[in-house]
Amino acid sequence: MTSQATSQATSPALTTPVDAAPQISLATCVAPLVEALIRDADALRLKVSRGPRDALIVDAGITAAGGLEAGRRIAEICLGGLGRVALVPTGRFSPWDTLASVSTSGPVLACLGSQYAGWSLAAGDFFALGSGPGRAIAAVETLYGELGYRDRGEKVVLVLETAVVPPAEVVDEIAARCAVAPSDITLILTPTSSLAGTVQIVARVLEVALHKAHALHFPLEHIADGVGSAPICPPSPDFLTAMGRTNDAVLYGGDVHLFVHGPAEAAKDLATRLPSLASRDYGRPFGEIFAGYDCDFYKVDPLLFSPARVTVTAIDHGESFTAGGFDPILIARSFGG
């Protein structure tokens, strides 16, 4: 889900922290992926430079071409090195025959603790929501108190969905919040209208499901595993069109399977309430919904931001529950097919 469409939800504190293995550091897990991204920058059509305050800037679509593979790798960085993203063929939404498929061994920490775009960064006319493992070092969001997790890493990596380089004031804020030197900050910039931006947004399909489960007050500590997929939409030079398509990919084409502990009835209830179909705003391309609310995200039903189809398996009971469904016709209408 495009980062502008997300919102901070609240839920009761977890009874157990998600970092059951305290030695896990998102910053440490992601470091090899970031190093490889920078090393392969030319092949990935990225531009790497030192920006404001000597922060490392990775341009994945502003002046650089970027591409699908760059977006795939950036999506894995967003997951804090705890997940895998693959581009796989499908016949479900022809001619849009490629899915971003996401899996992670630690869905709560990877998706909510890292990938979720929850850190608001603003200065002057600049605004972006930060996602990625650096959020867990700053831990400015109340979410981290609920997760019982904070990273003590010394290298900060954030992904920003933006078409402009952040000003020095934003770098200063990140450095202060994370207690690091600005030169230890890496900012990966992925415009919504770029190929890399498209992939890394669509690859949030599992995160969107976790975020809604959080909003529905489902106990996050009961979520053991998860996989998800959504179709890769064509980018558009028009921001609103690009933003609408990336949202529609998840709302009408997203598929998520969660594996949970606890009563089978709770799994069934989650499956019923989780799909986008449960929202009052379901049924039109997101661009039309957004325009109908005068381009104000806060007027859109927050329950809309969820995958099209959801399966929840109660692993302690061997029962699975599926709700929602795909809308290939609406996908084609949104994508331009």
UniProtKB/Swiss-Prot annotation:
Please give the GO cellular component terms listed in this UniProt entry: cytoplasm
Q: Where in the cell is it found?
A: Cytoplasm
Pathway per its UniProt entry is:
One-carbon metabolism; formaldehyde degradation; formate from formaldehyde (H(4)MPT route): step 3/5
What EC number(s) is this enzyme filed under? 3.5.4.27
In its UniProt record, which GO terms are filed under biological process? formaldehyde catabolic process; one-carbon metabolic process
- Major subcellular site: cytoplasm
Query: What SUPFAM superfamilies has UniProt attached to this entry?
Result: Methenyltetrahydromethanopterin cyclohydrolase
One Pfam family name is MCH
List where this protein forms a coiled coil.
none
Listed under catalytic activity are: 5,10-methenyl-5,6,7,8-tetrahydromethanopterin + H2O = N(5)-formyl-5,6,7,8-tetrahydromethanopterin + H(+)
Molecular function terms from GO: methenyltetrahydromethanopterin cyclohydrolase activity
Keyword annotations for this protein, in alphabetical order, are:
Cytoplasm, Hydrolase, One-carbon metabolism
> Which HAMAP family does the protein's record reference?
McH
Q: Into which family does the record put it?
A: Belongs to the MCH family.
What is the annotated role of this protein in its UniProt record?
Catalyzes the hydrolysis of methenyl-H(4)MPT(+) to 5-formyl-H(4)MPT.
Name this polypeptide is given: Methenyltetrahydromethanopterin cyclohydrolase
Organism per entry: Xanthobacter autotrophicus
- What does the organism's lineage look like at the top? Bacteria, Pseudomonadati, Pseudomonadota, Alphaproteobacteria, Hyphomicrobiales
